């Protein structure tokens, strides 16, 4: 899959191929349809967030469609349209 990857603070991120996510029993895989860039992305880009380690996949406000569900997921189905709240940082 493609991702916006920051390799060095205060430089443009690159769009790169990265490994597809692995769907664990308590997770879902979402095909991204839209992703916002916000102030916390700017802080990450500046190097002002001590939790950001490089390389860093940018963007965490997204909407998409579920393409795979884990074995323990009962509330969602493949094909559901979803938004993802900012609870965990990017690239996890």
State the predicted function of each range:
Residues 40-46:
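Cytochrome P450 core scaffold surrounding the K-helix E-X-X-R motif
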Residues 5-7, 46, 66:
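Residue-level signal for short segments within beta-strands and strand-turn junctions
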Residues 11-15, 39-40:
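Short N-terminal binding/cap micro-motifs at the start of the first secondary-structure element
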Residues 21-35, 48-92:
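Glycine-rich beta-strand-centered segment in the early N-terminal region that forms part
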Residues 2, 14-17, 31, 65:
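Residues located in well-ordered beta-strands
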Residues 3-6, 82:
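A short beta-strand micro-motif
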Residues 8, 20:
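Active-site donor-binding loop signature of nucleotide-sugar glycosyltransferases
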